[in-house]
Design a protein with these regions (language model features):
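Bacterial N-terminal signal peptides that target proteins for export
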Residues: 2-14
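C-terminal motif of bacterial Sec signal peptides marking the signal peptidase cleavage site
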Residues: 20-23
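Bacterial signal peptide processing site
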Residues: 25-28
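Gly/Pro-rich cap/lid or specificity-loop segments adjacent to the active site
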Residues: 33-322, 380, 384-510
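Flexible "cap/lid" loop of the alpha/beta hydrolase fold
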Residues: 249-267, 343-345, 352-367
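Structural motif
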Residues: 309-324, 332-336, 368-376
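Long, low-complexity segments enriched in small/aliphatic residues
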Residues: 353-386, 390-391, 396
Length: 510
């Protein structure tokens, strides 16, 4: 699994891909003072002292277990939630340093799938040698009582609704789609929806830390995983060990500002793609200038809005919404640019299969028409963590010019996608605020200068907010930096994880 495809727009709206972004949630009660020591927080002793029963996962080298946590931390006697955990023990050589918890982002990304499919195999060997690599699927995600909302057919319809309404009828259709999505989540998963906040998951992580026998939590979080890690450090500063937050978010921003910033981030990523594309003899957007490339892409979107094209799936045609998602999916990693060029060329020949394949990968849709619960969990967490970016369609329409200014290519779609939480059945419990984690050990925040999903300025902001934050910069394209080929980045992070020595604040790598 590629971490660079896991962050989703806060709006998780129709077609407009992008990333999450939820600011720092304050939902749920904070632990009392006893949480800063080794004792369990009041009323939670049974959870902190349970025994994990490890078993074979059916995946070579990995063990799995089920951890119980209170469904409602405010009322721990009101029932449990079962959370899936997996680990791969340190390979050696060298002295074991404890556990390293990993999270790929989302929200809604399966940390266990990420661990088993990438982290425990692809993280630098010196790190895997000395840490047990561990993951927990957050509540509401994948193996941990997953949120469900729509059938596969319903989700197919949802992803094809026009995301850039041109008249009142289209606005009503889009609003109805958001409302149906929210109603489906309430119908199928209403009992868990109030209890999947980032604060809840951060508290689950502390229970797991205790059960693993670690005095402090060591952690690598990418994308939304940075928000989760920062939340943990804010709740449990004395228990925060070596934390790496790669591709960070600014938890002080409200949803509308986050979405607009992200819109600009994807515009910048497209400009990088276009600058590369026009140098290629086969660039389907022209070979003259990035401005012409942008004009040609917008014209393609307009044509697909008016007349969707065959996609290779007889039940789905490629319209503007799915095409936009396909393009944005390729913005996460420059390695996908050749695939995007081919897909765009195909669309110009009325073959939408390439862009549809990119969109399906983004949505985690399998060939049999089934969807993973990524997008459902994404909405559930985001809509609980922050108040809606917009409450009404009129509010969106007023904001469209600002979004268009941030991104002439994607702005309008991102603005309308930001409406979805207005229909959510559970009121948000979090609010944006500065995250300082006073008293925590040094925390390394990694930012990529042309990151589309988590703009670089967010990493700068989080590093400045954290009382012990250290900013490590990768000057490059794509989403996140660790393990992406920069020896400078990898060496700095490995040294921190293995020796506890953070890089110099402000260090820059290429």
């Amino acid at each position: 699994m590629d971490t660079r495809r896991l962050l989703r727009t806060f709006a998780i709206g129709i077609g407009t891909a992008g990333l999450l972004i939820s600011g720092c949630s304050t939902g749920g009660s904070s632990p009392n003072a006893s949480a800063t020591g080794t004792a369990a927080p009041e009323g939670l002793t049974a959870y902190y002292t349970q025994k994990l029963s490890w078993r074979d996962c059916g995946v070579e080298g990995f063990e799995c277990a089920t951890m119980k946590a209170p469904r409602d931390y405010d009322k721990p006697d009101d029932g449990d939630i079962d959370l899936a955990v997996s680990r791969k023990k340190a390979t050696g050589p060298g002295k074991r340093l404890g556990s390293l918890l990993v999270n790929p982002g989302g929200p809604g990304g399966s940390a266990i799938s990420y661990l088993q499919g990438y982290a425990a195999l692809g993280y630098p060997a010196p790190v895997r040698a000395r840490y047990d690599m561990v993951a927990i699927d957050p509540r509401g995600v994948a193996r941990s009582e997953p949120v469900e909302c729509l059938t596969g057919k319903e989700m197919d319809a949802y992803t094809q609704v026009d995301q850039t309404p041109d008249d009142e009828a289209e606005v009503q259709k889009l609003s109805a789609a958001f409302e149906k999505f929210a109603q489906g989540c309430e119908k199928r998963s209403g009992e868990i929806l109030p209890y999947v906040s980032t604060v809840d998951t951060a508290r689950d992580m502390d229970v797991l830390r205790s059960l693993l026998g670690d005095e402090k939590l060591n952690y690598v979080g990418a994308s939304y995983g940075t928000f989760l890690g920062a939340t943990y450090a804010d709740l449990f500063p004395q228990r925060a060990g070596r934390l790496v937050l790669d591709g960070a978010m600014d938890p002080s921003l409200p949803a509308v500002d986050m979405n607009r910033d992200q819109t600009a981030g994807f515009e910048g990523a497209f400009q990088s793609f276009a600058a590369d594309c026009v140098k290629q003899p086969d660039c389907p957007l022209g070979t003259t200038s990035t401005a012409d490339a942008a004009t040609n892409l917008k014209q393609l979107f307009k044509d697909l809005d008016a007349k969707p094209i065959p996609s290779g799936d007889e039940d789905r045609k490629l319209g503007e919404s799915l095409a936009t998602t396909g393009v944005i999916a390729a913005m996460y990693d420059e390695a996908a640019w050749p695939q995007l060029r081919e897909a765009l060329a195909g669309a110009q020949r009325s073959d939408g299969s390439g862009l549809l394949s990119l969109a399906d990968s983004y949505y985690e849709r399998s060939p049999d028409g089934k969807y993973a619960n990524l997008m459902y969990a994404n909405a559930a967490v985001n809509c609980l963590d922050l108040p809606p970016a917009f409450d009404t369609p009129d509010a969106v329409e007023k904001a469209v010019p600002d979004f268009d200014k941030a991104s002439p290519v994607f702005g309008r779609g991102f603005a309308w996608a930001s409406l979805n939480c207005a229909y959510w059945p559970t009121e948000a419990t979090g609010t944006p605020h500065r995250t300082e984690a006073k008293g925590a050990a040094p925390i390394v925040v990694v930012g990529t200068t042309r990151d589309p999903a988590t703009p670089y300025k967010w990493s700068q902001a989080l590093a400045a907010q954290l009382s012990s934050g250290t900013l490590l910069t990768y000057d490059g394209d794509g989403h996140t930096a660790y393990g992406r080929g920069s020896d400078c980045i990898d060496t700095a992070i490995n040294t921190y994880l293995l020796e506890g020595t953070p890089p110099t604040d402000g260090k820059k790598c290429t």
